[in-house]
């Protein structure tokens, strides 16, 4: 049996990051965590491009556009959606998730889902570097692994 898996060596990888500006008090921390993890794993700072979009709903569009350029080995998406009093939360979360999956599946470039979806602000803060770690770090590590896995199929 052959086992195929990606490694966590970021040297030589080009990574795109799409960040939603809405709730930027959280998304900026996710971005910092992702950038730090990429650098610690050997990705050169000049090989990281960051695109800011208004919010989580717009992330799939920019992620797909970045992936279509074929300049990137992986795309990381970072956003925060916090439940409010209306059903808006459900629509944004569902469509963002579908769009991110579609971007990966139609382009052949790994697109990592890094949209933090929470019931309240406290949960979002916990996932941006306090009790629950930093989801930006997790996404960066996943991007490196998936980029290297994808390369092994070429």
From Swiss-Prot:
One of its GO terms (molecular function) is 6,7-dimethyl-8-ribityllumazine synthase activity. Keywords: Riboflavin biosynthesis, Transferase. It catalyses: (2S)-2-hydroxy-3-oxobutyl phosphate + 5-amino-6-(D-ribitylamino)uracil = 6,7-dimethyl-8-(1-D-ribityl)lumazine + phosphate + 2 H2O + H(+). Pfam families: DMRL_synthase. The active site is at 88 (proton donor). It comes from the Bacteria. Signal peptide: none annotated. InterPro entries: LS, LS/RS, LS/RS_sf. SUPFAM superfamilies: Lumazine synthase (SSF52121). One of its GO terms (cellular component) is cytoplasm. Changing residue 88 to A: 10% of wild-type activity. 17-fold decrease in the affinity for the pyrimidine substrate, but no effect on that for 1-deoxy-L-glycero-tetrulose 4-phosphate. Its EC number is 2.5.1.78. Catalyzes the formation of 6,7-dimethyl-8-ribityllumazine by condensation of 5-amino-6-(D-ribitylamino)uracil with 3,4-dihydroxy-2-butanone 4-phosphate. This is the penultimate step in the biosynthesis of riboflavin. Is able to use the non-natural R enantiomer of 3,4-dihydroxy-2-butanone 4-phosphate as a substrate, but with less efficiency than the natural S enantiomer. Cannot use unphosphorylated 3,4-dihydroxy-2-butanone, 3,4-dihydroxy-2-butanone 3-phosphate or diacetyl as substrates. Belongs to the DMRL synthase family. Forms an icosahedral capsid composed of 60 subunits, arranged as a dodecamer of pentamers. Can interact with riboflavin synthase, forming a lumazine synthase/riboflavin synthase complex, also designated as 'heavy riboflavin synthase complex', which consists of a trimer of riboflavin synthase enclosed within the icosahedral structure composed of 60 subunits of 6,7-dimethyl-8-ribityllumazine synthase. This is 6,7-dimethyl-8-ribityllumazine synthase. The gene is ribH.
